[in-house]
């Protein structure tokens, strides 16, 4: 994603990313929502594995640890979260990002989303969390995720929503697109998936974010990064408010939001 930057700038960029992802309200709230979705997916996977092992006899009783792959793992914040659900590992194109993963003791290797360095049907669960929108060929990346996911396994996808919400952060992050729910669902189906659930997320801050981006476009104000906009006094509160959406999302699909979350299954 930052391959064209000088080495010192890449290291600085990923150092900022590592710090921001650990504490910024948006990432904290997103992880709370993702954990809720992951718990549901993992429960289904573990129930299926227990049933299969029970049929195989006492020698295979119990639930084996799930293998999980985080595509585009970056500096490892999501990989740390995923590790509580099984044997998680990551893949990323950036050596600098991978170095942060290794410093945290996380398993990660270099590779492209469009040509993942894994055998067919290796993982019970694969994730791409704000990654697919970076790809020149998003369907190719999703097909690779489908390939390395075991039959009966799941992929959890999180992407930004609506091109008319395009902002400075999209430019900084080298995004190619912001999706509608229909668009990302269509691409996942083209890759071979069955969609179990698709919903918008971050309804809580939809209006303020839309208003802020319209204001910046009208005034020409361009912050170095939207993550640098100072909300330090409210950071903890914002994280809790965003994360609280997980309660509503247990039973409701939001009709609109800043992001989209999709649970896709390999049948």
Q: What spans do the regions from the language model cover?
A:
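Conserved N-terminal segment of class I S-adenosyl-L-methionine
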Residues: 1-47, 65-121, 125-129, 142, ...
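Short, glycine-/aromatic-enriched active-site segment of Class I SAM-dependent methyltransferases
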Residues: 15-19, 155-177, 181-189
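Short Gly/Ser/Thr- and charged-rich N-terminal loops/segments
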Residues: 48-60
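Residues lining the SAM
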Residues: 129-132, 158
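A short glycine-rich, Lys/Arg-flanked "PGG" loop and its adjoining helix->strand segment in the class I
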Residues: 139-154
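Conserved S-adenosyl-L-methionine
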Residues: 193-203
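C-terminal helical/coil "lid" or tail adjacent to the Rossmann-like core of SAM-dependent
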Residues: 205-239
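Core SAM-dependent methyltransferase catalytic element
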Residues: 213-217, 255-267
